[in-house]
Amino acid sequence: KSTLINRIIKHKVSIVSDKAQTTRNRILCIHTDDECQIVFLDTPGIHKPKHKLGEFMDEAAYQSLRDIDVVLFLISGNEKKGPGDLFVLDKLKDVGVPVFLIINKVDLMTKEEILHKITEYAELYPFAQVIPISALKGDNVDAVVDELRKILPEGPKYFPDDMITDQPERLLVAEIVREKLFRCTRDEVPHAIAVYVEEMKDRGHNKVYIRVTVYVERDSQKRIVIGKNGTVLKEVGNLARQEIENLLGSSVYLDIWVKVKRDWRNKSGALSELGYKNE
């Protein structure tokens, strides 16, 4: 989902990972061109939650189904239909708005496989549109915008032309660090990670100091995040700093600390402190 949104917006506003449930917050993203303005809500993936964080993520996704005009239901075309897909489609039965089926990763499929996938899903739900794409390569992504432009109701322009997201800089910085941690760690460790920007200070002369705390649930996870002689954390810091500098247009000193906050994903107070709270 996030790869598609970033491709449409033409900026990186959502972090990307091949791991499930990467997106935790609802992210508002804005596409503006000469003909229209389309507001997208990049939601956490709907799933059966295993902890309070998962419940928060599901609620954020369900809240996004209110006051919308179209749903984009995105699947990986090269993967078999699973119970998760059927679970989400069942939840969409009463949504009351058109649903587009977006078949992603068609660059990895034959024409016959694409046609079979379209037929398979058409039997499950009355989709308003079916659009095969490759979000990574950008193939047919323009068709998504074109079809949305046709079906969306006219309304006022809610945001300035140069605005692409409602996310504050601090949250964007935290998400960049979390994305790099996803890339550099393994197994279940990424899902036990939370990132919080403690301090973000302009020191003048185009230099910004940022202090970030990475929270994990166990001491063993802390050791993995830091790495032998700090190698993992150093790599995360270097990758994140480069992207944050591009985001802010400033030289950045990134100070990353790792702390253990035991079982934070199951504690409402900890979730709220870390910014995971629904409106």
Task: Locate each region found by the language model.
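Amphipathic alpha-helical transducer elements in NTP-driven molecular machines
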Residues: 21-24, 54, 58, 65, ...
